Amino acid sequence: MDYRYNLNLQYHLIPDRMLVNMNNDFRYVSNETRDTVADRFLKKDYSGLKSNISGMISSVALQNKWFQGRLTSVLTGRHYYYRLGGKTVNLAYPGDAVPAETHKSDQYWGYSLALKYDLSSHWLMKFALEHNFRLPRYEEALGDRVTTLTSTELKAEQANNYNLGIMFDRYYNANSRLQFESNGYIMQVKNMMYLTSVVGYSKYQNLGEALLYGVDGEIKWDIDRNWFVSFNATWQKSLD
């Protein structure tokens, strides 16, 4: 069973200047194993093992306009909740293949700040910083009992992101438009979730930290309503 919903509410505190946005995103996945072929091969009955995972991200964002609307700021706070429960079994050699009861939950706090400043009618600058998390998905934490092992000890992936960019956007007529955008970014990632190989199986594990930084740029020219030309380039480097 896979159940999910997303609720979003927006309220204008000051018309055309300040608004607050509240969002709640929830997902619950449960599964009951039933594989008679595998049970006969392993000479054990593992059918009926139930496990579930749920994750919820709640956020509140405050958007404000300053200096006659030339500067826009968005400040966001986030709460992450993660829960894992049920029975799992480790089928990898030399595991004992005995079902184990697992119940764990974690919560995290994140935030972000985004700024956009209109330099002129065609040019703008933007900046963003973010401290966020990525919660483990069902297949990452609980596997599939076929090719991917369970990984109930898996932690949420944590990232600190920084971005600085500039953008040009101009219409020359109703169908002709020129756009240019360039960004520089830094990403610091901790507890990265990687799919690794374990004795004939695969398993998701947290593998340390990484630093990723780079720049990218893109130019797009809409010649008319039927034709356009674009070019983009990216340079990046990662350090483990």
Predicted regions and their residues:
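Hydrophobic, lipid-facing positions within transmembrane beta-strands of outer-membrane proteins
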Residues: 3-7, 54-60, 109-113, 125, ...
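Membrane translocator/pore-forming domains, dominated by Gram-negative outer-membrane beta-barrels
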Residues: 116-118, 219
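Short acidic-glycine motifs
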Residues: 1-2, 134, 224
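Beta-strand C-termini and the immediately following turn/loop, strongest in propeller blades
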Residues: 168-170, 223
